[in-house]
UniProtKB/Swiss-Prot annotation:
Family statement: Belongs to the bacterial ribosomal protein bL35 family.
Protein name, as recorded: Large ribosomal subunit protein bL35
BP GO annotations: translation
Disordered: region residues: 1-21
GO MF annotation: an example: structural constituent of ribosome
A GO cellular-component term linked to this record: cytosolic large ribosomal subunit
Signal peptide: none
Alphabetized InterPro entries for the sequence: Ribosomal_bL35 (IPR001706), Ribosomal_bL35-like (IPR021137), Ribosomal_bL35_CS (IPR018265), Ribosomal_bL35_sf (IPR037229)
């Protein structure tokens, strides 16, 4: 049976934390900042953790991610 491969697009978007969680970056940060407040832009800079409902699905795509 062949090995399960890592989903490369997901591997570029998620990082494993030391405690075993998954860190992600926020959407809506590439353009059109004139419609967003300063507070929104500041909060979009911060990384966030993957929610528990999505964790299992994303973890299965990142089988060999350290």
């Amino acid at each position: 049976m062949p090995k399960q491969k890592t989903h490369r697009a997901s591997a570029k978007r998620f990082k494993r934390t030391g405690s075993g969680g998954l860190k992600r970056f926020r959407a809506y940060t590439s353009h059109r900042f004139h419609g967003k407040t300063k507070k929104q832009r500041r909060h979009l800079r911060k990384a966030s953790m993957v929610h528990s409902g999505d964790f299992k699905r994303i973890k299965s795509m990142l089988t060999r991610l350290k």
